[in-house]
From Swiss-Prot:
The lineage of its organism: Eukaryota, Metazoa, Chordata, Craniata, Vertebrata. GO terms for molecular function: enzyme inhibitor activity; growth factor activity; heparin binding; integrin binding; lipase binding; phospholipase inhibitor activity. Residues 17-207 are annotated as: Sufficient to inhibit LIPG/EL phospholipase activity. Changing residue 224 to A: Abolishes proteolytical cleavage. GO terms for biological process: acylglycerol homeostasis; angiogenesis; artery morphogenesis; cell-matrix adhesion; cholesterol homeostasis; cholesterol metabolic process; fatty acid metabolic process; glycerol metabolic process. This is Angiopoietin-related protein 3.
Amino acid sequence: MHTIKLFLFVVPLVIASRVDPDLSSFDSAPSEPKSRFAMLDDVKILANGLLQLGHGLKDFVHKTKGQINDIFQKLNIFDQSFYDLSLRTNEIKEEEKELRRTTSTLQVKNEEVKNMSVELNSKLESLLEEKTALQHKVRALEEQLTNLILSPAGAQEHPEVTSLKSFVEQQDNSIRELLQSVEEQYKQLSQQHMQIKEIEKQLRKTGIQEPSENSLSSKSRAPRTTPPLQLNETENTEQDDLPADCSAVYNRGEHTSGVYTIKPRNSQGFNVYCDTQSGSPWTLIQHRKDGSQDFNETWENYEKGFGRLDGEFWLGLEKIYAIVQQSNYILRLELQDWKDSKHYVEYSFHLGSHETNYTLHVAEIAGNIPGALPEHTDLMFSTWNHRAKGQLYCPESYSGGWWWNDICGENNLNGKYNKPRTKSRPERRRGIYWRPQSRKLYAIKSSKMMLQPTT
């Protein structure tokens, strides 16, 4: 800038020095040599000014060039950012399209599942009706078979007996196939339901809004009948001094495990097995250990009790109810699997009367294995010949009397005693097992169910 000002100052001087000689001659003739020297000095000054101006312009150009380069770099960065933003926007649009397609697919699958569920329920109802009809036919055929065997002409009618047996087996196989089909359809429905829930969960995360084995075993056989557990009731005059449960027996100084007679309040006296191995008294209500006792019993026997107190037994629902009406009790389950690992779980519980099908309501309080009994749910007891209204055919399919949930297959400590790897898969499902929700199934080798008052 200073150079430019100097240049503007020098230029007029140079111009003034170049005045026409004819005009300057009017002043004085002898001054001509002095004017020439003045013009040379002015030219030098002008040249110097121009040189400085050139350097100044050069510096200005360099600075301007640097600023322009900075501007271009910023423009390039902006262009790259805009390009990246455009790519990301396109990706988001593609993801949105994909999610919308997924949502449409989900809606279609949901409709398919609903239709399948309706169809499955219809098939299940028809299968159950058909099964009931087949059971009536089988019972009628069994009666005919019994009459044929007992009749004097039974030996002569052997071909007819063989034919009846063959027909019964065919009907049994038909029931097995039908129930297996229902089981497979239930599994498919459960898998699709889980897939739908997973997709819905993903959709909720993106902000765009739009099962245990439920298997039914195949075979329903009539169980052999075992005599009810003997009460060994004592005379009324002797019952007043009897303890109310095994805790009362223990408090009287009897610290050895064994069979004792107790008399709960408002009940007759009966024998129980008191277990003191853990250092505290427990009243056993069920024991499984070797399969010597068949537990696929009738409702009447499950109410009265069956088996041997020094072996495998079920104490009886009536006696269990009489015990637990006296106080608040803890239900303890001790389980041993086929790897000889020992587990236990304890529940606080409430047991209903005969009128409620001995409804069980539990809440887990302790244990080293997850509980498989549904908590805070009414579980009604049922057997193959006594089923609460609305329940599935769990006892017929899985064997034994138990507190069943809305679905079968979660747990059953009164099932058929099966050794591992000796039976087919349907038979294993009818065995003794414990399956916490969404976890592995424990095949049980031995089990104990026992009671102890909380106070």
